[in-house]
């Protein structure tokens, strides 16, 4: 299959005003996507965005391109990515578009697409859109132009949707929860959800200004929420990323509970209730500790390529329900078609209530092995995955680790980075091994 030039593992992403993320490309992309989607019978598209200041720019450009292709557009403003997926289904739109760079800084942005069922586009469809980008932009006749409207009650609809995943007979009364919204798309959603379910909520990262999304807050910057949980003597913390599709948690002692441990909690809870269908899908980055803990419970575990779209593919292939990434993308196909940080948090809280257990107790059966991830820029260098020097460094580390460790080298799908992951029993050794491989990559430049 031909390689994609614009789409990465999660849509199109980059620095605003440079490369892929320009207003000109967004206009053309809206038109190209509109042409491809219209051939499949699409007539209506929903557009949501996060809180980046550039969201206004790309929203207008996409809107114009889609209209030029003859598609109607419904705008919902700042809303989490999973909310766009949900609203795309409930409004019977044929596609949804999210303007977000997820956990990246404010000066980046991105564009990703959903089908009518809320699932992401396949690679083949993205290639069709890229083929249209090579053609000159045209416009349908005036009477065929798409119309544009706005959904004013989108936030309220999504809040009720999130709450519907919590058992009606349960309440969060008596729990104090710190909720970190990353100054992102969940700022007006997540605190309300958990308050309305009965919890005492302390919100942080809930004051976006267009420039502060993911800035020292959120699921990729956990120091602030860990500190706040301890200061407030809270029962737990829930950290979301800029577009609300990933979650990390914090127990009452200020320890981070990552996506692997959340998967373990959900799988154990489903098994206890007799509703676990098959096993669990993780990724190449999932901690070996998750694999071992699930083995102890006779729960099958398989690994996909990195990216929640590939987790979804394996879930469908095996007809399983639960999967995700250690970075906090959690999928439970009984509760939605895409990763949803708020809903994943609700499912963990439901398990706590059902079992009258704390986060510490729910994670007692899993021991995470030390895992170190080093990101190394290689822009302008030779392909590090083809370098004999880098491969030799990797082989040397693997020999030292033996059966109790792993090494994974993976290129980022959105940035010129090589991700060096090393896992083993001793953190000091693992850190040194990861840095040894990273140094081999740096020496290529």
UniProtKB/Swiss-Prot annotation:
S-S bonds: none
Binding site for Mg(2+): 102, 241, 243, 245
Cofactor dependency: Mg(2+)
SUPFAM superfamilies reported in the protein's UniProt record: Phosphoglucomutase, C-terminal domain (SSF55957), Phosphoglucomutase, first 3 domains (SSF53738)
GO biological process, one term: peptidoglycan biosynthetic process
Reactions catalysed according to its record: alpha-D-glucosamine 1-phosphate = D-glucosamine 6-phosphate
Catalytic residues identified in the record: 102
The EC number(s) this enzyme carries: 5.4.2.10
Modification(s) after translation: Activated by phosphorylation.
Root EC class: isomerase
Residues modified to Phosphoserine: 102
Keyword Phosphoprotein: yes
Keywords: Isomerase, Magnesium, Metal-binding, Phosphoprotein
Highest taxon in the source lineage: Bacteria
GO MF terms held by the record: magnesium ion binding; phosphoglucosamine mutase activity; phosphomannomutase activity
Function: Catalyzes the conversion of glucosamine-6-phosphate to glucosamine-1-phosphate.
Family, similarity comment: Belongs to the phosphohexose mutase family.
Name of protein: Phosphoglucosamine mutase
């Amino acid at each position: 299959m031909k390689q994609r030039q614009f789409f990465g593992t999660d849509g199109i992403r980059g620095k605003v005003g440079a490369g892929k993320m320009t207003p000109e490309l967004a206009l053309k992309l809206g038109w190209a996507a509109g042409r491809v989607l219209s051939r499949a019978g699409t007539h209506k598209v929903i557009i949501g965005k996060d809180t980046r200041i550039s969201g206004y720019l790309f929203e207008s450009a996409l809107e114009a391109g889609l209209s030029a292709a003859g598609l109607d557009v419904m705008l919902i403003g700042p809303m989490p990515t999973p909310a766009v997926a949900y609203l795309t289904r409930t409004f019977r739109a044929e596609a949804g578009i999210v303007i977000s760079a997820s956990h990246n800084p404010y000066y980046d942005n991105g564009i990703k697409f959903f089908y009518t069922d809320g699932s992401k586009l396949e690679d083949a469809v993205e290639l069709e859109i890229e083929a249209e980008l090579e053609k000159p932009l045209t416009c349908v006749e005036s009477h065929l132009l798409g119309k544009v409207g706005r959904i004013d009650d989108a936030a309220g609809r999504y809040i009720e949707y999130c709450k519907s995943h919590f058992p009606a007979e349960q309440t969060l009364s008596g729990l104090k929860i710190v909720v970190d919204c990353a100054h992102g798309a969940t700022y007006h959603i997540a605190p309300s959800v958990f308050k309305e379910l009965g919890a005492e909520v302390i919100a942080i990262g809930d004051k976006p200004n267009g420039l502060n999304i993911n800035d020292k807050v959120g699921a990729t910057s956990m120091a602030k929420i860990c500190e706040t949980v301890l200061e407030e003597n809270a029962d737990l913390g829930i950290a979301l990323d800029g577009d609300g599709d990933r979650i990390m948690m914090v127990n009452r002692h200020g320890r981070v509970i990552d996506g692997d441990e959340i998967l373990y909690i959900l799988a154990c809870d489903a098994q206890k209730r007799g509703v676990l269908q098959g096993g669990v899908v993780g990724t190449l980055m999932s901690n070996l500790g998750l694999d071992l803990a699930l083995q102890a419970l006779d729960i099958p575990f398989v690994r996909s390529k990195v990216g929640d779209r590939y987790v979804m593919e394996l879930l469908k292939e095996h007809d399983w329900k639960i999967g995700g990434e250690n970075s906090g993308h959690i999928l439970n196909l009984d509760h939605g078609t895409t990763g949803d940080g708020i809903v994943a948090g609700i499912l963990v809280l439901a398990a706590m209530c059902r079992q009258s257990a704390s986060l510490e107790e729910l994670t007692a059966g899993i021991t995470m092995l030390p895992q170190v991830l080093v990101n190394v820029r290689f822009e302008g260098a030779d392909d590090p995955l083809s370098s004999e020097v880098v491969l030799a460094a990797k082989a040397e580390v693997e020999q030292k680790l033996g059966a109790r460790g792993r090494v994974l080298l993976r290129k980022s799908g959105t940035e010129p980075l090589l991700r060096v992951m090393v896992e083993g029993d001793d953190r000091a050794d693992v850190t040194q091994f990861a840095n040894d491989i990273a140094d081999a990559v740096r020496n290529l430049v």
